[in-house]
Amino acid sequence: MENYKDKHQEIRQGVRALCGQFSAEYHRKVDAEKGYPEEFVEALTKEGWMSALIPEDYGGSGLSLTEATVIMEEINRAGGNSGACHGQMYNMNTLVRFGSKEQRERYLPKIATGELRLQSMGVTEPTTGTDTTKIKTKAERKGDRYIINGQKVWISRVQHSDLMILLARTTPLEDVSKKSDGLSIFLVDIKSAMDSGMAVRPIQNMVNHETNELFFENLEIPSENLIGEEGKGFKYILTGLNAERILIAAECIGDGYWFTDKVTSYVNEREVFGLSLIHI
C-alpha cells in the first residue's frame, strides 16, 4: 500500500524549507503586535503554495484538496499559523469549480501571481450563525447590477484581501419551496465596495489576522460578478465551507505535531538531579 507521507514528501519538504526562513521570533513579534505576517504570506505566494488549487492553465499548480491539507498541516507543524492565509485555499475551491470561464480567466492568473488575494468569505450574520438558510442580507437585481443590503459578522482577512465571496439572498425565504434555494454568491471587489456602500468595523479579538463586522447599504455589484446560477449559492458555498473544515482539521494535526516535538525536545534536554526528565 502506498504510504501517504511518502507520496507527499516533496510538498512537505518544500513547505518546511520555506517556513524555516521565518524564525519563531518573527511569528512571536507579529502576534505580540497583533499584526499580520505579510512577509510570510508573500513568500508562500511567491513559491506557489497559495495557488496550489488553481489549475495549471491559469498559472497554478493544479493540485487537489488533499495536497492543500498537506501544505496547511506543514505550515503549522513548522510553527507558523496558516489561519492568516488559509481562506485563499477554500475560497479558491468555490471560484475554480463554479466560476464562469470569464471569471476564471480574469481573476485566477492574478491570484496565482499574488497580484490579487481572495482570502475572505462573507457568510455569517449576527442573528443566524451557522443556520445559513436564514441569512437576511439581500441582493436585489436591478438591470445589470445587484443592490446589496444587510450585515455580516466574524468576517476574517478583509484587510488583507482584494476579493471576497459574499452570500446573499436573491429570493425571499417565504417565496421558495426549499429554504436552501434563493441564495446566491458574488465576487466582491473589496476596495471598490468600501468606497460605495460597504462599511468595515474591526472586532478586536483575533491574533494574526483581523475579523470584522460588515455593513452593506445599497452596495452595487455588477451582475457579471454573480458566481454560478442565481439562487443556487447554498450548494456552491458548501464547497468552500466543507473545504474550510477539512483544511482546519489538517492545521490542528500540524499543531499537534509541533507541540509533541516541543515537549519531546524539552523532556530530553531538561535535567533534574542529573537526569533528563524523560529518564525520571
What are these model-predicted stretches?
Residues 1-86, 106, 110:
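Amphipathic, small/basic residue-rich leader segments at the start of a protein or domain
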Residues 2-7, 77, 197-278:
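Glycine-rich beta->alpha junctions and the first turn(s) of the following alpha-helix
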Residues 48, 71-76, 167-170, 187-193, ...:
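Short Ser/Thr-interspersed hydrophobic loop/turn segments at strand-loop and sheet-helix junctions
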Residues 62-74, 131-135, 215, 221:
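Structural signature of FAD isoalloxazine-binding scaffolds in flavoprotein oxidoreductases
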Residues 83-102, 129:
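N-terminal glycine-rich flavin-associated loop
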Residues 114-123, 167:
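A short, Trp-centered hydrophobic/proline-enriched beta-strand micro-motif
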Residues 137-140:
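A structural signal for short hydrophobic beta-strand segments in well-ordered beta-sheet cores
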Residues 144-145, 149-197:
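A short core secondary-structure module
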